[in-house]
Amino acid sequence: MYCPFCHNDQSRVIDSRVIDSGSAIRRRRECTQCKNRFTTVEKAQLLVVKRNGLTEPFSREKVIVGVRRACQGRDVSDDALKRLAQQVEERVRLHGSSQIHANEIGLAILEPLRELDEVAYLRFASVYKSFESADDFESEIRLMRRRDRSN
């Protein structure tokens, strides 16, 4: 890590704290040469393997954008979307792998979204599961009701 002030490559860690529910570490550093202090954030990179085989870094923002579309016109706050995106990231990181397939992210979105707003869940599921008819919606609603009764 180079000092942002003098570009020296030696620094010492003064303080370390876990942030983002344990998914990152914030370190306060001091340059051994100029004595200026700066902060770094370390996070294990999570790559998403897309359907076409390409990879890209996981983005909470992309989760929020996709779910926001399903929540359009619904009473769902930005804070609730941010919490959902954090839950999704935590869930996919539990796989313990540095790469995850895009469809697994969709699966990780479904349950927290259902708990947040059932209409938004149905909208998202209709795209994610490629619903083709009203029968697909009816089947999903029956499945939701069965799950509700068993809980």
From Swiss-Prot:
Nucleotide-binding in keyword set: yes
Gene Ontology BP term (one): negative regulation of DNA-templated transcription
Top-level division of the source organism's lineage: Bacteria
Stretches annotated zinc finger (unnamed): 3-34
Keyword annotations: ATP-binding, DNA-binding, Metal-binding, Nucleotide-binding, Repressor, Transcription, Transcription regulation, Zinc, Zinc-finger
Pfam family, one: Zn_ribbon_NrdR
A GO term for molecular function: ATP binding
PROSITE patterns the UniProt entry points to: ATP_CONE
Keyword Transmembrane on entry: no
Cofactor field: Zn(2+)
Domain ATP-cone: 46-136
UniProt cofactor note: Binds 1 zinc ion.
InterPro entries in the record: ATP-cone_dom, NrdR-like_N, RNR_NrdR-like
NCBIfam families for the chain: transcriptional regulator NrdR
Xref: HAMAP family: NrdR (MF_00440)
Family membership noted in the UniProt record: Belongs to the NrdR family.
Purpose of the protein: Negatively regulates transcription of bacterial ribonucleotide reductase nrd genes and operons by binding to NrdR-boxes.
Name of the protein described by the UniProt record: Transcriptional repressor NrdR
Taxonomic source organism: Corynebacterium diphtheriae (strain ATCC 700971 / NCTC 13129 / Biotype gravis)
